[in-house]
A protein has these predicted regions:
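Short acidic/glycine-enriched loop/turn segments that link adjacent beta-strands
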Residues: 21, 119-121, 156-158
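Active-site PLP attachment segment
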Residues: 5-50
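PLP-dependent aminotransferase class I/II
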Residues: 42-82, 99
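PLP-dependent enzyme catalytic core of the Aspartate aminotransferase-like
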Residues: 133, 139-193
Length: 193
């Protein structure tokens, strides 16, 4: 309940962790701050000739051709998560992330960016890697090993990030580990000091 939480602003993308369709994101703005927030794109609700009870809602109203079905899935996703004890599912996912983090760091001769605790590790882990060609590495993982995973440059570093959802298992992480190990042995894409 965001109003009882007392948040000024709160936004969430629900498509990954709540398994709703892409585009199902929400924005909550405390009434005290609604006048300060203008939409990036305006549509028919902006300066409407027939305003509703809320100029904030009017200003953020989207075009009539927008498909709202993704947003309408959010309540059912919350119901699904409650029904299937998603707190326990998420905890098991975090445990799987944490139990593999050091193994991957050792493989690429790296260190975790933060302590391996629930305060820092949710359902994903970014492994600092040394590569001069992150795009080629990402493409190789996909083309040869059929693994879709972010290989992301950030500043002067590159990160390989895995994430775990309810449908992932240790076998998936073993497949990734074996692929990275093979790439280290057969290419010069990942540098090991």
């Amino acid at each position: 309940n965001l109003s009882s939480l007392g948040a000024d602003l709160f936004t969430g993308a629900c498509h990954k962790w709540m398994m709703t369709p892409k585009g199902s994101t929400f924005l909550y703005v405390n009434k005290a701050f609604q006048r300060m927030l203008d939409p990036l794109v305006i549509s028919w609700g902006f300066n409407s000739t027939t305003p509703s009870h809320s100029s904030f809602l009017d200003y953020h109203q989207t075009q009539g051709t927008r498909d709202f079905s993704a947003f309408l899935c959010i309540p059912k996703a919350i119901e699904f998560m409650n029904q299937y004890n998603w707190t326990a599912v998420s905890s098991a996912c975090r445990d799987l992330v944490k139990s593999n983090a050091l193994r991957f760091c050792e493989l690429v001769n790296s260190q975790p960016l933060a302590p391996l605790t629930d305060d820092f590790i949710l359902q994903l882990f970014s492994i600092p890697i040394k590569t001069k060609n992150p795009i080629q590495l990402k493409n190789l993982l996909f083309d040869q090993y059929k693994i879709e995973i972010p290989v992301m440059p950030h500043g002067d570093q590159v990160f390989l990030r895995y994430s775990i959802q309810a449908f992932n298992t240790q076998a998936h992480l073993d497949t990734l580990y074996d692929a990275v190990s093979d790439i280290i042995k057969t290419t010069n894409l990942i540098e090991i000091d």
